[in-house]
A protein has these predicted regions:
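Extended beta-strand/beta-hairpin segments
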Residues: 1-52, 58-148
Length: 148
């Protein structure tokens, strides 16, 4: 229920999403529900961040597609990043990130609608939004590259 302040203005509280993981002595990772993932030493935190960025981008797209009755029927893709010392503060961080996704949508929206849906997917992926260096995206939709 929204709270009403003394000045009569209604303050809405943003929805909160909470996540937790556990790290086992063997390096395995588990979610709060107990689902486990055994990761080899070649999986660095940076790789996991990129995997999260790709999954988040697709989940965001799927959300916006669902609102207009369109299905994401298949998807493949990847991401890359450059980590180095930032000029602004001298700390090592992601200074460049790019995402490339190829998706199949049914039914296929009009070109203007596709551009809007892709923009919303990029904007609303909280992993990408959390990065100081905003990711660049390259989308292929139903076999055609979509420049943004």
């Amino acid at each position: 229920m929204p709270a009403v302040c003394d000045d009569g203005v209604v303050q809405l509280k943003a929805k909160e999403f909470r996540y937790a993981i556990g790290l086992g002595a063997d390096g395995s990772v588990s979610t709060e529900s107990g689902a486990s993932l055994a990761l080899g030493t070649e999986w660095t935190p940076e790789h996991l961040l990129l995997a999260g960025l790709v999954r988040c981008s697709l989940d965001s797209l799927r959300h916006h597609l669902g609102r207009v009755g369109i299905q994401l029927t298949s998807s493949i893709g990847g991401a890359s990043a450059v980590v180095t010392r930032r000029e602004s503060d001298g700390r090592y961080a992601v200074v460049e990130a790019s995402v490339e996704l190829s998706v199949q949508l049914e039914p296929e929206p009009a070109p203007d609608a596709i551009a809007e849906l892709l923009a919303k997917a990029e904007r609303d992926c909280f992993v990408g939004a959390s990065l100081v260096a905003k990711p660049s995206y390259r989308w292929i939709v139903n076999g055609r590259q979509r420049d943004r």
